[in-house]
Amino acid sequence: MMKNKYSLNEEEIHLFQQSVAGTKRINQDTVLHSPRRKKTSYIAPERIQQEQIDASYYFSDEFQPNLDSEGPTRYVRGDTNHYELKKLRRGDYSPELFLDLHGLTQMQAKQEIGALIAACRREHVYCACIMHGHGKHILKQQTPLWLAQHPDIIAFHQAPKEWGGNAALLILIELDEP
């Protein structure tokens, strides 16, 4: 039998009973305090749909950007410091939004990636994670090609293990100045 780490001897129990003598048990009040929620602004469904269309407009299946085939999947826009890639690789950025493409068709994946980019810009999210998975390697091959075509993508790199490893990409999105 294990001895309780915080067991009290009889003297301590008696002292406690004396100190709480004459107190009454409080009944639970019925007031429930709900956590304060961040005020979310209403976004018209038409605007969201237009943002998705605008963002997926850039994704062509015919265009083949010149991506480095050696090593992990990575890309940095020409006007961006290559140090951003190193920070992505090391996991210095934590993604705030995640997109899981498992089970989607190429067309659905393009729409969802477009929606993710639009949501990141709207919510001022600089780093996001796209999980394309392994599967038949179709989305794994196509996702970087689509992302490299989009003007709002600053850089992307194969995600560190904690964010999905070689089955995911961390992306940096260009944001409008607030």
Curated annotation (Swiss-Prot):
Q: Which Pfam families match?
A: Smr
- Which HAMAP family does this one have? SmrB
| EC number(s) reported in the record | 3.1.-.-
Keyword field contains rRNA-binding: yes
Q: Which SUPFAM superfamilies match?
A: SMR domain-like
User: Which SMART domains does the entry link to?
Assistant: SMR (SM00463)
Extract one GO BP annotation from the record: rescue of stalled ribosome
* Keywords noted in UniProt: Endonuclease, Hydrolase, Nuclease, RNA-binding, rRNA-binding
**Complex formation:** Associates with collided ribosomes, but not with correctly translating polysomes.
GO molecular function, a single term:
rRNA binding
Matches recorded under PROSITE patterns: SMR (PS50828)
Protein name, as recorded: Ribosome rescue factor SmrB
Enzyme class label: hydrolase
The role this protein plays is: Acts as a ribosome collision sensor. Detects stalled/collided disomes (pairs of ribosomes where the leading ribosome is stalled and a second ribosome has collided with it) and endonucleolytically cleaves mRNA at the 5' boundary of the stalled ribosome. Stalled/collided disomes form a new interface (primarily via the 30S subunits) that binds SmrB. Cleaved mRNA becomes available for tmRNA ligation, leading to ribosomal subunit dissociation and rescue of stalled ribosomes.
Q: Which residues form the signal peptide?
A: none
Report if keyword Hydrolase is assigned: yes
Q: Which family does it belong to?
A: Belongs to the SmrB family.
Q: Where is the Smr domain?
A: 99-174
Domain of life, per UniProt, equals: Bacteria
